[in-house]
Regions:
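Internal maturation/activation junctions in enzymes
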Residues: 427-451, 459, 476-578
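Catalytic alpha/beta core of large soluble enzyme barrels
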Residues: 91-96, 382-385, 541-553, 560-703
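A glycine-rich phosphate-binding loop feature that marks nucleotide/adenosyl-phosphate handling sites
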Residues: 139-140, 153-157, 199-205, 245-253, ...
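Polar, glycine-rich mid-to-C-terminal structural blocks
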Residues: 259, 268, 272-349, 357
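Function-dense linear segments that define catalytic or interfacial modules
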Residues: 103-107, 115, 122-132, 137-164, ...
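Often metal-dependent polyanion-binding catalytic scaffolds in large enzymes
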Residues: 1-111
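Glycine- and Gly-Pro-enriched alpha-helical subdomains that act as flexible
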Residues: 213-227, 255, 626-630
Length: 703
């Protein structure tokens, strides 16, 4: 039998007697959910002191976090949080929080936290000081900033998982490196992060081992091993571990790699739960355009001849040399056939992700560290890595640099409601300081190369969500020039104030360890942003000063500050595919369009739940186009607007109608590459029969 709140929620999908949408029913559903479910199932305490003592003494809250500033200040922060009288505006937002985030008793039947409690513990765990903690509480409760799921879920809990969303490991062509990578993957997955891994350096199937020909097994057995490992590391049974493997398009195993995702693949090679990504250089597109063959190069021979791993070489730059070098074994396939196969697999499964290698490396803020060779589980984290070396006993000879990135997103609609430049800058800085604090205090001793990379880069990933919700509320079509102009100005402003915050943080934390030789130091990165600022419509920008005539002057001033002071962080932005946290925040996901004005979700035993898009009214619902109606071209163009401002990547999902063909997917791939977009995440087809495209997405990065 359905509860009252479920009935009320379902009524929002029905027209009322007066012919209008009954959107107010969703607020009634949220209220009924509290009265009928949350309140009766919440443990009652007579005082905050009683509650705090109970949760600390029973090993549920961390004493160090809760009492970081003393109990009196903890109480004051709690009073501050509850003073907002926060109410979830949607039933799904309330349901998501209490089903997935709120702390419960041991048998899971009763709640021990409310939303405000979780917010306060999050602020306490990752604030710079008491004043910043208060600011963080305000930003989260008023909906302008929301930390990612691992951070928000685990903050302040005793014996909980880690706060970091994403990790990326590189693996070299030796057993010691492979063994270490599997161990690290298990440990990082256990702590709640999604793990991306580059397999490009692994020698291909049939290559020699110790000069014995035909002995190597290639990448697929490693993929099978990783799939089992991530299934095993299921984070205390809460959710299955998650990983993604990336392979360069010019690796000899590339076609077998793609075949593992075919619906009719042999069970011996079929990969069911591991995500796949392909790293595609510029040269691959050039060869396809000219309808030429593309050569695949043996990583074993490349490393033997060049003295460095295959992934550390630009295939585009060295392609002709590699082709003409007789010492390097190679095979060839038709380049168009490769892209056709890529589209076929994406049509069937939604995979693989695509990372445009040369686009990404042209935007690399720290080429002095190394090349960017792969991405993460959601294709938005992109940082350079350094290989580790090992002794024969498996111990590190020298630790390299691997990647971690903590995430949080700004709500574009709420940010645009701020009255002036000072308020806008303040919100950006509060979010920045929070994420910077996560980077500083996170402990990952189980993976020394990740620790070293984090300490030297201090990378963060500030993201964005609710773009379409904001446009709906403003009456601006997603696929319009005005939408692009306004969004360009918004991303410009966020980037400008975010860089300023990192400059100021140098006074506290010093420059990030890899600063010397970076594009921050030589000024080329700021120069590129200054040039991009010429496209910004001044009418929409919040960057104002009576002393400068245009935005380029502002960027020149910022360049001077970086030159004098430096930067505290190697990376600042990444736009993830926000999921659960978008519902809690009453946002549309990430920066792509909605899939329906009123989204229908299936939530376990509860069944269907209805979620209206932010800004939706009876008057404008007929004007709201879905992602499938808008199509891939306009979505790619919007992501291209954001890409120059984001120093990492953006999770770009492409949506196609049921009439789409593999040729349409290929056209979208070419458009994305030409537009300067850095990666493609999932391919989604509207037809119901292709259930394989409705994949379980990355819980870690989906905020």
């Amino acid at each position: 039998m359905k509860e009252t709140y479920q009935n009320l929620n379902s009524e929002i999908n029905l027209w009322g007697p007066d012919g209008s949408l009954q959107l107010e029913k969703d607020k009634e559903a949220a209220r009924a959910y509290f009265l009928e479910h949350v309140n009766p199932n919440t443990v009652f305490f007579h005082s905050l002191k009683e509650k705090t003592d109970y949760l600390i003494d029973n090993g549920l809250w961390s004493r160090d976090v809760v009492l970081r500033y003393g109990f009196d200040e903890f109480k004051r922060l709690m009073q501050h949080a509850y003073s907002f009288k926060f109410r979830f505006p949607t039933y799904l937002g309330a349901f998501k929080f209490y089903s997935s985030y709120a702390l419960r008793n041991e048998d899971g039947t009763r709640y021990l936290e409310r939303f405000e409690d979780r917010v306060v513990l999050t602020a306490l765990a990752f604030s710079e000081d008491l004043e910043h903690a208060e600011y963080v509480i305000t930003e989260i409760i008023e909906g302008r900033f929301q930390p990612a799921t691992p951070t928000f879920l685990n903050a302040g809990r005793a014996n909980a998982g880690g706060p970091v969303s994403c990790f990326i490991l590189r693996v070299e062509d030796n057993m010691e490196s492979i063994s270490r990578m599997v161990t690290d993957s298990l440990q990082l997955s256990k702590r709640g992060g999604g793990v991306g891994i580059s397999l490009t350096n692994i020698r291909e199937a049939g290559s020699p081992i110790k000069k014995f020909e035909g002995q190597a097994s290639g990448v697929i057995p490693i993929m099978k091993m990783l799939e089992d490992a991530f299934s095993y590391a299921n984070q205390l049974g809460q959710r299955q571990g998650a990983g993604a493997v990336y392979l360069n398009a010019h690796h000899p195993d590339i076609m077998r790699f793609l075949d593992t995702k075919r619906e009719n693949a042999d069970e011996k090679i079929r990969i069911k739960t591991l995500s796949l990504g392909v790293v595609v250089p510029d040269i691959t597109f050039d060869l396809a355009r000219e309808n030429r063959d593309m050569y695949l190069f043996s990583p074993y021979d490349v490393e033997r001849v060049y003295g460095k791993p295959f992934s550390d070489i630009s295939v585009t730059e060295h392609y002709n040399d590699l082709v003409n070098d007789e010492r390097i074994r190679k095979t060839k396939i038709n380049a168009r056939k490769f892209f056709q196969t890529l589209a076929e697999i994406q049509f069937e499964s939604g995979y693989p992700y695509i990372m445009f290698e040369d686009t990404v490396n042209r935007a690399n803020p720290a080429p002095n560290v190394g090349r960017i060779i792969s991405s993460n589980l959601c294709s938005e984290i992109m940082q350079p890595q350094v290989a580790s070396t090992f002794k024969e006993n498996g111990e590190f000879a020298e630790e390299g640099q691997d990647i971690s990135c903590n995430l949080g997103s700004l709500n574009i609609a709420k940010m645009q409601q701020l009255a002036n430049q000072d308020e806008f800058s303040h919100s950006v800085r509060v979010a920045y300081k929070f994420l910077n604090r996560v980077a500083k205090v996170t402990e990952m001793e189980s993976s020394p190369s990740v620790v070293k990379g984090n300490n030297l880069a201090r990378a963060i990933g500030l993201g964005q969500m609710n773009l379409h919700g904001w446009l709906i509320s403003e009456g601006i079509p997603y696929d319009s020039e005005e939408a692009q102009e306004r969004f360009r100005a918004y991303m410009h402003d966020v980037t400008y104030f975010l860089i300023g915050a990192s400059i100021d943080q140098v006074q506290i934390d010093g420059r990030f360890g890899n600063y010397s030789g970076s594009r921050w130091e030589d000024g080329s990165l700021i120069d590129a942003l200054a040039e991009e600022s010429k496209k910004v419509n001044l009418e929409y920008s919040r960057v104002r000063s009576p002393f400068t005539e245009d935005l380029v002057d502002h960027w020149n001033g910022l360049k001077w500050e970086v030159k004098n002071d430096g930067m505290a962080n190697q990376h600042l932005q990444a736009i993830p595919p926000t999921g659960s946290i978008s519902y809690i925040n009453n946002s549309t996901a990430s920066i792509h369009p909605v899939t329906a004005p009123i989204e229908i979700r299936k939530e376990g035993k509860v069944g269907r739940v209805y979620y209206p898009a932010y800004g939706l009214t009876s008057e404008n619902i007929s004007e709201v186009k879905t992602a499938y109606e808008i199509g891939p071209e306009a979505i790619i163009d919007m992501y291209a607007v954001a890409s120059p401002w984001v120093d990492q990547g953006l999770s770009l999902t492409l949506f196609f109608r049921d009439t789409a063909t593999t040729r349409d997917i290929n056209r979208a791939q070419v458009r994305a590459h030409k537009s300067g977009v850095k990666s493609i995440y999932y391919i989604r087809l509207v037809q119901k029969a292709l259930t394989g495209t409705q994949v379980d997405e990355c819980v870690s990065c989906m905020l």
